[in-house]
């Protein structure tokens, strides 16, 4: 019993060491950045067109539900307790599943279908700076400092830089594309703030599995009721789906564990690197044009990371 507690303490301390926090947070950012082109490639391989709303929800639901089930099976194999501390906490976990998975990715998949992967990746950083600011209001471990404010402002300038110019995807704001990505970002921000509460109600690993499995199911059911199908199933399409499941499993497991034992803002700010990875991977895999404004926006977001992590608290 003592040895088990000692191992748990060591595991927690590993996720609190600055070097490992950076490594794990960067790993989550890299795998999430690659989700942008893989989703578009998956849609293409499964013959899901932009107007097939039900099919997109079904595709997303299958991805997250399977990811959540994998996490729960691993938790069971490791004999991690599934016990929720209070029955009343079930409502909180359901709400978390809605924001972390259902709302978050319903908006994300819709928006990505009407926006270039590189543009969506950078616009999605709105959630990062929202979390950094709001965390200072909700958690004592996150203090609002001049550096944090400057980091968020500079990062937000990256989003503004994305909308400059009239070339390619810089033609202006659209609700179906940009609007949905922004709503996705806000849902992600709310979920990030709720993660600390999840860790107080159930093991964070189990909570992550619950949120993905349940949230995925809440995407599958309405998607199916809306007539959603997977029109074409190919080996390559299944490979893309498996990769996306792996991305969800890895990204959420690492990110949520880090959020549960570190200042939220210090962890969330690393997601500013997602647009850089998303833009590069979209250009490499989809043949999208890499405009200079992507580079400028990515550089500003990276500068924001430095400022937030340089400060104390």
Predicted segments with their positions:
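Transmembrane alpha-helices of multi-pass small-molecule transport proteins
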Residues: 2, 49-100, 130-134, 187-191, ...
